[in-house]
Amino acid sequence: MPTATVPLRIIQITDLHLKTKPSQLWGVDVDASLNAVLAHIQGRNPAPDFIIATGDLVGDEPEAYGRLRELLEPLGVPVYCLPGNHDFPAVMGQVLRSGSMRWERHLVFDNWQLVLLDSSFPGTPVGHLARRELALLDTALAVHPDLHTLVCLHHSPLPVGTTWLDTMTVVNGEALFAILERYPRVQAVVWGHIHAEFTGRRGNIQLFATPATSVQFNPDAPEPKVDELPPGYRWFELYPDGTLKTGVERPEPATRLIAA
């Protein structure tokens, strides 16, 4: 954990789309790509303090959470999980809350706090933040206004410039930013869902989307199109003075499969 000079080190993984058996998604071997990412994470030195898994952890099969545990627990660090539109929050809350798998939504450290928001909305790929989620955020920021803050969710809270993806943002994203913009120590918001990397800014708040561990989408295409980039993940270093460093790693090789 951070000291005066050592940062809090976090890994974000997202959009695993794991099934109960090895599978493909848009021609990508989901298991092989995830294993490549996890092997890369295990090789990091220094190791992360914990991992944030920001949704679409399984591909519409609630039984796959057992496999997810088996793959993530060997990492040896806590894994905090959020649901996406392909997940089952009630099942997640039962299966992913023991051992290294965690279900806490508000994490407080010496100089930083993380707030994990559930943006899933049953039956649709669109995101929505329920009143309880906005209240969780507002309370955390009001109670700890002195802490630097990183907010995590699954869906994009605002358009990212990709026509088809921008139909699936958080529909009440402005309500989110109305809260965030009242607190000057909110440093960044990070999400997944778009299967691509994104970096932006809204006022003083940094914005990051993280590539999937599975298939990658071309953010410049007007309709869904697979990108040939390898799977990826994001790392964060959060320093006591509020400095935030981040980057994306894409383990080689790419794992796109050619259909027989």
Stretches found by the model and what they are:
Residues M1-R69, V160:
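N-terminal active-site segment of His-dependent metallophosphoesterases
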Residues A4, V28-D31, N35, I179, ...:
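Binuclear metal-dependent phosphoesterase catalytic core
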Residues P7-T20, N111-S120, L150-C152, I205-P211, ...:
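Active-site-proximal beta-strand elements of phosphoester/diester hydrolases
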Residues T14-H17, G55-L57, N85-H86, S119-S120, ...:
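Active-site metal-binding loops of divalent metal-dependent hydrolases
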Residues T14-S33, G59, F88-M101, P122-R131, ...:
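Acidic/histidine-rich helix-loop elements
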Residues S23-Q24, A53-E73, F88-M101, G127, ...:
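Metal-dependent catalytic neighborhoods of phosphoester/phosphodiester hydrolases
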Residues V37-F50, V126-F208, G242-L244:
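His/acidic metal-ligating clusters that form di-metal
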Residues V79-A90:
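A short, structured active-site edge motif that brings together acidic residues
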